[in-house]
Amino acid sequence: MTYSGDFIRRTRNPITHQSLLNRRLAMPHFLGMALLIGVMTGSAYATDNQQPQQRKTIQKPTPAIHDVHNGDVPSPSVAPEYKLQTVSREGVEYIEKLRKGTPFGTTDFNLEGLRAGMGTRNEPHLEGVKLIRLKIGDIPCEWVLAPGADPDVRLLYLHGGGWVSGSGGNYLPLAVDISVAAKCAVLLPDYRLAPEHRFPAGLEDCIAAHEWMVANGPSGPCPAKATFIAGDSAGGNLTLATLLALRDRKRTLPAGGIAISAATDFTLASESLRTIHDPIISARTMPEFRDRYLDKTDPRNPLASPVFGDYRGIPPLLIQVGEHEMLRDDSVRVAKKAVSDGIPVKLEVWPGMVHVFHIRGLPESREAIEHIAEFMSACAYPARAHAPSIHSSAAVPQRFCRRTTWKVRRAPRCR
């Protein structure tokens, strides 16, 4: 199986402005919690009672997809000029609203307030969803199984929250969206948090949860057909670190990994930390998170800062990040490192988007989740389809439009 090694920024099929005005978009059913490094202050997360609706977008020209072999991935040393390059009206309005606010952590770091928001349970609003609470050893967890999902295709989702806050219950709506789109069971672990439990306590919980999930599903003991690990922000960091640790310990690896808006470098060397004004979170928070999580651990430890990892032997990766978030270059750099180690990587830098935009209830949010589902399907069922197709348009030179196949490992079906 081969992979082209391209870094990909997807574009969407154009529709007219008038047709967008004539369509009614789904309305949000609840407000989400303030999240930064997995949390967003003053933002809304939408989930629908129905299946995800058809995308309603306006095509705007975007730069070409970047080819890693030509060395023209988004330059970490160049901050994109702030222009509303989102392709949906909702995205434009949402980001304009964000720009009027104050990013989290601009004046102070309120850990208690952060935990209060991120610890709130957000019940999903889709009928027929199965929620199963359990413990893996001492780790509280919850299964999420949407109607029609395959319980033997399993995703371990690691929540964000800066390593110091957050809970699986706060991420139930996103877990439902992924379960619906990817037709998989989603396991949400409440891994241990800093500063009470510093590195590598939370990471060890993530490793243990995946090892358990390989042999156990929502209905009890049963080998998985395929497993995946995903996470956002701090959870994206833990996703990559868990993959590295599983490989190093010669444990069963998942079929693929998905890192969303991941923080990958505790040396804080990414240029975007200084050049991008993030409307969600202030760069001042990064030393606060680091010091509470790492304490005296070397910030160049690959299990703490995955950008310094050796990715040989790691399964395929899907990396998604917003163009206008301060952690953008963390994703770009780790993707380049993994590709240099010979690993299949798909990097999506979403024009105009912000930190963990998947939870915002935007058309881009739904499309990004669809991309996750496509990636998982390509890894779990290689005989059914090629890897996620790459749409071409006038804005994307044909030389960047290549197909991909992914290496997959299988497990026996339950009887």
Locate each region found by the language model.
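A glycine/proline-hinged amphipathic helix-loop "lid/cap" segment
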Residues: 47-144, 384-389
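Short amphipathic alpha-helix adjacent to the substrate-entry channel of hydrolases
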Residues: 169-187
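Alpha/beta-hydrolase active-site loop
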Residues: 197-217
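Gly/Ser-rich "nucleophile elbow"/oxyanion-hole loop immediately N-terminal to the catalytic nucleophile
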Residues: 214-228, 249
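Hydrolase active-site cap/lid region
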Residues: 244-297, 313
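Short beta-strand/loop motif that positions the catalytic acidic residue
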Residues: 319-321
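Catalytic histidine-centered segment of alpha/beta-hydrolase-like enzymes
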Residues: 353-363
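Catalytic active-site module of serine/aspartate enzymes centered on a nucleophile-bearing elbow/loop
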Residues: 362-390
